[in-house]
């Protein structure tokens, strides 16, 4: 059996890979590991996105948590970053999110936050996994009044929205904003926050039915929002993913403004105000080379990590940085929240837009994006890490790097949640790098499928 936890909790096809039994075991073992040392009745928050499997998995997860004597506070459908924030705000011992983020609706996932609102380190996940593999035989089995119970926190969403609004001063009166909620967890929170901040808000994909989350919409399918922004002549558009821990923007001309550009815009704004910690932005190896060029020209430093917001966060915590994130729109403002937060990011970008008086296209122009092609090679889960040892693949990558002569790069990495190897090639000529990426994908699929 491979490791249960991936890069972002436990994830799989609901009722096939992520079963109610596994959800129960995760609730049971997770609650025990995260609250075993407490001297009081442990309190654990549980929230979810809009997937049809959420109710099934929530029932099982909560049963597991209650079976070891913990109290569950059910928050219903709510963004992932809200759980991270509210776990701290409500003095809970842990928080749990039922979501598969940007994945299709048939997938779901379970991830934990500790009492400080941080995702769990590998060592804690390993303890949870060990208990599950051992069948949970040694776990406490409280009876009578010591069995856990569930209650509801009716104003949780409002508390989160008020927190996000409180991170800025002023309002967004006069700014026309289009938002795509991906039929996901932001469908109430995002409109509520922006309406309250007096923006002129138009919303699409805010009618979840359990199966339409991320379906042709949201931050992984931007075309609908791009067209909508131009159609209604909005100043800016925002597309969230299914659990709203990431966001991408669209400028007034319908062009995508990605996570790298958002960090560049906000980073420069904070630097100019003298409040960007060490004048540094933490990004990943997948960030566009244009971010590095911009930083060099503007007196910023870019620190690079492995792909994954957990690694970005780790670097930020270790070295005291306040701004970091990924090209995909996972952006962390560590002086406000402990994880990527799509709504918080949208509000911070709107603040820059309002204060600068500039159009988003002008702000985004501070960074020239080098053409970048990302193609997924479909491989087996068992073989997706073997590209590191494959001489043919290694030789082809070396030849491509030589061909680019320092004006491009090749990056290969396995997906943490799916049977894929992601091939990213960056360079000056889009046609050439697209052709080379397709050639490399064919080789990888031929050797690792």
Curated annotation (Swiss-Prot):
Its cofactor is Mg(2+). The active site is at residue 101. It catalyses: alpha-D-glucosamine 1-phosphate = D-glucosamine 6-phosphate. Its EC number is 5.4.2.10. GO terms for cellular component: cytosol. Mg(2+) binds at residues 101, 241, 243, 245. The modification Phosphoserine is found at residue 101. GO terms for biological process: carbohydrate metabolic process; peptidoglycan biosynthetic process; UDP-N-acetylglucosamine biosynthetic process. Binds 1 Mg(2+) ion per subunit. InterPro entries: A-D-PHexomutase_a/b/a-I (IPR005844), A-D-PHexomutase_a/b/a-I/II/III (IPR016055), A-D-PHexomutase_a/b/a-II (IPR005845), A-D-PHexomutase_a/b/a-III (IPR005846), A-D-PHexomutase_C (IPR005843), A-D-PHexomutase_C_sf (IPR036900), A-D-PHexomutase_CS (IPR016066), Alpha-D-phosphohexomutase_SF (IPR005841). It holds the Pfam family PGM_PMM_II. Transmembrane segments: none annotated. Activated by phosphorylation. GO terms for molecular function: magnesium ion binding; phosphoglucosamine mutase activity; phosphomannomutase activity. Keywords: Isomerase, Magnesium, Metal-binding, Phosphoprotein. Belongs to the phosphohexose mutase family. NCBIfam families: glmM, PRK10887.1. Catalyzes the conversion of glucosamine-6-phosphate to glucosamine-1-phosphate. This is Phosphoglucosamine mutase. It comes from Ruminiclostridium cellulolyticum (strain ATCC 35319 / DSM 5812 / JCM 6584 / H10) (Clostridium cellulolyticum). The gene is glmM.
